[in-house]
């Protein structure tokens, strides 16, 4: 049996080889996983910034220092804490500079690094994600500011989506997802809403964590590139993307099958019409007094 070609053309194979070489020069030891149409890297994002397509849209939830002491995701609240340590970067100031050269940029948690955003230089806007959605304030962040510099930034507004500890709206509701996949996992519905505000074909998340942005991008029909320096997050993101693509594949195959069976139904109907016409033609006309 002939071997399946990994690359459609020689040029594609050469390009992939050049990309691998560039990757190893920029970040020796970086891992790369291609799960078409997604590329995932395990490496420090800042080193890989030059590899990213310049026309892509950055949609990311970066790590940043939360408060003076930092937010402790390992602190138990009602239930025992799920995480034994905070994720990388939660104790450092975030510098958005490497990502601001992209034509479309959506940054979550912007209230933690206001002073580094170029608020005078390009069209930008703000959205407030209201996480309490009308519930009583508790020991959880009431909301989060999102900074957007997109082709046509929307007017400032509010996204309401319940997200306080175990109380989560949408597909991450505790009945569907009892344990979160990442200490700072974001809701799929919110990420999809943000991606819809961008126009680029490729969505870039340099701090992908468990890969929520990538899955959201796939659901919005975009390709995506994600980076995380933590190998565990990288593994979770890879398996999420793979599972999503399988689902989408099954869904597409289901849609195609439904389309085929509709076409079959239609041709069957057309066949029946032809048959009925033929029967009409071949049946000798009954005398008028014997017509039913
Ligand atoms: C706030 S979390 C993202 C969570 C994600 N939105 C989700 O839904 O799962 C930030 C992620 O950035 C990663 N990170 C921190 N510093 C990084 C760096 N320099 N390069 C790449 N990833 C980094 C952390 O490991 C963490 O997984």
Short names for language-model regions:
Residues 1-25:
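BZIP DNA-binding basic region
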Residues 8, 85-93, 181-185:
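Conserved phosphate-coordination/catalytic loops
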Residues 26, 51-60, 64, 68-75, ...:
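Class I S-adenosyl-L-methionine
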Residues 32-40:
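Beta-strand-turn-beta hairpins that frame and shape the catalytic cleft
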Residues 40-42, 191:
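Membrane-topology and secretion signals of cell-surface/extracellular proteins
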Residues 43-47:
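Conserved SAM/SAH-binding loop
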Residues 66-92:
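Mobile active-site "lid"/loop adjacent to the S-adenosyl-L-methionine
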Residues 91-103:
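A short glycine-rich, Lys/Arg-flanked "PGG" loop and its adjoining helix->strand segment in the class I
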């Amino acid at each position: 049996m002939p071997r399946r070609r990994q690359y459609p053309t020689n040029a594609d194979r050469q390009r992939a080889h050049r990309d691998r070489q560039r990757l190893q020069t920029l970040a020796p030891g970086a891992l790369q996983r291609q799960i078409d149409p997604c590329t995932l890297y395990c490496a420090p994002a800042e080193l890989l910034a030059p590899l990213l397509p310049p026309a892509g849209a950055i949609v990311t939830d970066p790590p940043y220092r939360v408060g003076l002491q930092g937010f402790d995701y390992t602190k138990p609240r009602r239930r025992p804490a799920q995480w034994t340590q905070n994720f990388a970067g939660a104790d450092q100031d975030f510098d958005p500079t490497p990502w601001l050269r992209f034509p479309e940029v959506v940054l979550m948690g912007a209230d933690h690094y206001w002073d580094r955003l170029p608020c005078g230089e390009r069209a930008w806007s703000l959205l407030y994600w209201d996480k309490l959605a009308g519930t009583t304030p508790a020991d959880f962040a009431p909301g989060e500011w999102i900074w957007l510099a997109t082709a046509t930034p929307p007017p400032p507004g509010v996204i309401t989506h319940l997200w306080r500890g175990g109380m989560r709206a949408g597909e991450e509701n505790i009945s569907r997802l009892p344990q979160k996949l990442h200490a700072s996992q974001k809701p799929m519905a919110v990420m999809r809403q943000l991606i819809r505000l961008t126009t680029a074909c490729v969505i870039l998340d340099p701090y992908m964590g468990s890969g929520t942005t990538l899955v959201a991008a796939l659901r919005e029909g975009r390709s995506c590139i994600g980076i995380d320096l933590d190998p565990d997050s990288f593994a979770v993101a890879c398996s999420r993307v793979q599972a999503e693509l399988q689902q989408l594949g099954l869904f597409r195959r289901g849609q195609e099958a439904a389309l085929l069976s509709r076409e079959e139904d239609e041709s069957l109907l057309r066949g029946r019409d032809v048959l009925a016409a033929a029967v009409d033609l071949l049946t000798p006309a009954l005398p008028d007094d014997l017509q039913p």
